[in-house]
Swiss-Prot record:
Organism listed in the record: Saccharomyces cerevisiae (strain YJM789) (Baker's yeast)
Disordered: region residues: 483-523
Cytoplasmic compartment spans: 219-230, 287-304, 355-381, 439-523
Protein name, entry field: Membrane protein PTM1
GO CC annotation, single: cytosol
Location in the cell: Golgi apparatus membrane; Early endosome membrane
Entry-linked InterPro entries: GOST_TM (IPR053937), GPR107/GPR108-like (IPR009637), PTM1-like_N (IPR053938)
GO biological process, one term: retrograde transport, endosome to Golgi
Amino acid sequence: MRVYQFCRPFQLFTYFLCYLLVFVKANKEKISQKNYQVCAGMYSKEDWKGKIDPFISFNLKKISGLSDESDPGLVVAIYDFQDFEHLGVQLPDEEMYYICDDYAIDIGICEEENRDEFIVQDVVYDPYTSTNRSLANPIMTFSQNEVGLHDTRYPIKETGFYCVTAFRSSTSTKFNAVVNFRNAYGQLAGTEINKLPLYGLLAVAYVVAMALYSFAFWKHKHELLPLQKYLLAFFVFLTAETIFVWAYYDLKNEKGDTAGIKVYMVFLSILTAGKVTFSFFLLLIIALGYGIVYPKLNKTLMRRCQMYGALTYAICIGFLIQSYLTDMEAPSPLILITLIPMALALIIFYYMIIRSMTKTVIYLKEQRQIVKLNMYKKLLYIIYASFLSVLAGSIVSSFIYVGMNTIDMIEKNWRSRFFVTDFWPTLVYFIVFVTIAFLWRPTDTSYMLAASQQLPTDPENVADFDLGDLQSFDDQDDASIITGERGIDEDDLNLNFTDDEEGHDNVNNHSQGHGPVSPSPTK
């Protein structure tokens, strides 16, 4: 039977399918009549040491719809991606013919001994280099119509990007199989193994940075701002989260993609949702002036910030749980039920941060508080630099592959793409957080800075300040620190951040009788 009609789109499709499949996340991949090709990066034992010799195996789990006992069922090819052009022969009518069957044998494009196998050409013309090209690595091809593990494994002698393709001999045939891309070092996919040492190093970096911050925290334990306590708690959380990420890759490399590993991944995603949400929350309260412009925020305002953060966290958790319950091979539009609210929640968070930061900077300019203003300017520079760094990583990676043909790009991209898409943003986040923590670290003057203003810059609004008032930070009601004697209706404070809610106008209004801030030690 002529089978090229089933294979006609193979050559063009291979380019795009393999590029999309370059990020195989597990070393065992399913293959079926719907998804008849899978690819993954593989390391040779020389490039990445391990206990076993790396290989690719094919295990047919289910097959049905065979016409008779002579039906070959599946025709399978295992090959290095750069050799895909060696599969099949172009007929005079410009159709590609891939399987060695009766018709192919009759017209002389393959031999009887290769019946029910892929047609393989040892030398082909390469249109990219305009030269003849030989096989880079052997191509293994066979047919199978019975359930079970194929006897022969494909050995990996060279590091590369390898593919497995399975064609049906009949459109009525249905099958399910598992392809095992087994590297020498363990169960992790080739695209993930570099994350294991990198996240280990990142965990060590977090521990060192946290130790340095903790030392400053302990040294000034009697002069701490609430914000600095938040930062230390988040430092501990981020350090633990990074260690958990490293442990995930280590366990997955040892155990494989088991049910326990999947549960662990859900747990890890919950931690990641907390990391994202609390990062936005910290930036929001800093943007509102917490800890530097004002020792504390109004209690109602702080509570509403916390409630909005908790709501965002719950939405992120819902999205993650739904994404794990959704079949990625058949995605459902129902995922939008949680995706859209999560996107909106983060956008609103970002808007509130930028708006609050802008108002705080304007207020500091009006009050001529140069030191605090410079701190907030540095924070803005850090945020902008982080965005530019992530963007620059994507641009640089794109330029690296400019000029490469499709085959070379796919062959090389799988080993480094993870760094730009996964690890680079994580590394930028680490640098940004450590920089912000260093900027707001406990010092001999940080407590006084939050409790005072640069009096000579605004002499008309100066009010007396007593060092004994420092103790009152812990004794006064949170709201009175911002609102002073006048007080303010808590219902006037909401997350729309009008002028009465951010505390800036509270200070300005009170300055009519007492200076630029309330009588409490916010001067």
